[in-house]
């Protein structure tokens, strides 16, 4: 039996802001429990829902040196889906209205504390992992501290680490002097071949340099980040580590995302009866959002953070043109103010065609996946993307730009061979996107049989966590022996 510890800043169902939480909540329970004892460690945020806090059981506490002070570390645990979750408690660092704040140096101090506390807690918990699986820059100091401070202790000797990059754009950077003072790391670690990047300290870079293996969340993104366009300044380091770098696609939780058992949608359906049943979700959503009730009208869904990365500048450029077509567009998400206001404006201008829900709601997202005919994701870059996997699961055909995980998961429609599970375009160009949407409209309206055959294919593809878990298990066995 091999012991594995997942360390992350969020995880479903305890706390979630994005796709990282889905991975941390789903992957451990899909690993083979006959071979692995997998546990998860998270911060104990004050903003966790009360029902989640009620599940936590106090274990013990201790003090550790951090940022020139003796800091309190409280330990809690909970059982969820047969997995043990541990929580690091410190009210000074983890009391806030949201899991993350907008102050970069405070974030570095909080998650530097978390990284050191994770390692300090292990002997107290009596759990010695063979491997610690770290996620994103918030845990980037775990491999560094392990080598710098803990490796001399017999308990820690030989523990391996994996660093998973969910989005290379976020790296945890700040000036070296402040980071050195907070973390207590010596000058030795702040050189260009270690944590230093352009005269700043970079926590994700530290994790990539010191981890025994590096993964990211799709094979295409693993190749893209070795190039200057996608590499965010770390492409040279990632090329140097390419022997230990692999891309493993995320999956989705089929217990949560399955149209035949989804408690949020008015008309459940499956791969056999979707031709009759799926459309009932569309008419229900049209009524709920005040759109023109027309079951034949093509509905395009968007569920996303409203940011530049997601390609909303392309949509802004052609939205007026698109609204001249026989389509309805339903949007759910929050993000940059200009995009929130843009969708509010179009919802006002084209009230019977466009609905903008500027919020986040699990229930509405499920309703949009089920009701829409197509799902638009024109991302500038997309490490993996979960929304297109959910759309595929619900028989809603994705229209995507060929980048990262979108390229790996959506097979473009080929009318001559009768293959494909969606539509795609290659260049980051608004009119190329519009042409692709209009091509999809043409198939939807004029070749409905082909469209439905594509839905047959999308609903048969397996993007459950089972496949991804097998790939992770291969990597764990490579690092720590089967």
Regions found by a protein language model. Give the residues of each.
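Catalytic cores of nucleotide-sugar-dependent glycosyltransferases that transfer UDP/GDP/TDP-activated
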Residues: 1-482
């Amino acid at each position: 039996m091999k012991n594995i510890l997942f360390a992350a800043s969020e995880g479903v169902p305890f706390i979630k802001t994005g796709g990282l939480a889905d991975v941390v909540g789903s992957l451990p329970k899909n690993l083979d429990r006959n071979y692995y004892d997998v546990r998860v460690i998270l911060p104990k945020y004050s903003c966790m829902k009360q029902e989640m806090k009620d599940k936590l059981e106090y274990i013990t506490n201790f003090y550790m040196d951090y940022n020139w002070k003796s800091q309190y570390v409280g330990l809690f645990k909970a059982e969820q889906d047969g997995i043990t979750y541990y929580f690091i408690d410190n009210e000074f660092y983890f009391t806030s209205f949201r899991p993350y704040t907008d102050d970069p140096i405070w974030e570095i101090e909080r998650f530097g504390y978390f990284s050191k506390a994770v390692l300090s807690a292990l002997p107290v918990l009596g759990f010695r992992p063979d491997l610690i699986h770290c996620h994103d820059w918030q845990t980037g100091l775990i491999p560094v501290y392990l080598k710098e401070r803990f490796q001399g202790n017999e308990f820690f000797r030989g523990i391996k680490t994996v660093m998973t990059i969910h989005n290379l754009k976020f790296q945890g950077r700040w000036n070296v002097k402040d980071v050195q003072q907070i973390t207590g790391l010596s000058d030795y670690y702040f050189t260009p071949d270690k944590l230093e990047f352009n005269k700043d300290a970079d926590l994700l870079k530290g994790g990539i340099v010191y981890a025994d293996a590096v993964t990211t969340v799709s094979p295409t993104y693993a190749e893209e980040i070795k190039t200057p366009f996608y590499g965010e300044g770390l492409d040279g380091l990632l090329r140097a580590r390419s022997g230990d770098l692999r891309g493993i696609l995320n999956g989705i939780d089929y217990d949560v995302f399955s149209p035949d058992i989804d408690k949020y949608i008015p008309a459940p359906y499956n791969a056999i009866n979707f031709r009759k049943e799926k459309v009932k979700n569309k008419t229900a959503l049209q009524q709920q959002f005040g759109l023109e009730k027309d079951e034949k009208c093509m509905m395009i869904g968007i569920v996303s953070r409203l940011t530049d990365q997601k390609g909303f500048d392309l949509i802004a450029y052609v939205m007026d043109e698109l609204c001249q077509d026989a389509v309805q567009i339903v949007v759910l998400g929050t993000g940059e103010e200009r995009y929130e206001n843009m969708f509010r404006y179009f919802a006002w201008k084209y009230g019977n065609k466009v609905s903008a829900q500027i919020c986040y709601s699990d229930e509405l997202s499920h309703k949009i996946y089920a009701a829409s005919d197509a799902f638009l994701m024109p991302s500038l870059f997309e490490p993996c993307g979960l929304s297109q996997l959910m759309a595929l699961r619900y028989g809603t055909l994705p229209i995507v730009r060929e980048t990262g995980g979108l390229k790996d998961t959506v097979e473009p429609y080929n009318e001559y061979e009768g293959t494909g599970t969606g539509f795609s375009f290659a260049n980051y160009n608004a009119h190329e996107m519009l042409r692709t949407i209009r091509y999809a409209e043409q198939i939807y309206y004029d070749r409905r049989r082909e469209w439905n055959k594509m839905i047959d294919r999308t609903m048969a593809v397996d993007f459950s966590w089972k496949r991804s878990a097998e790939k992770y298990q291969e990597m764990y066995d490579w690092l720590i022996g089967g």
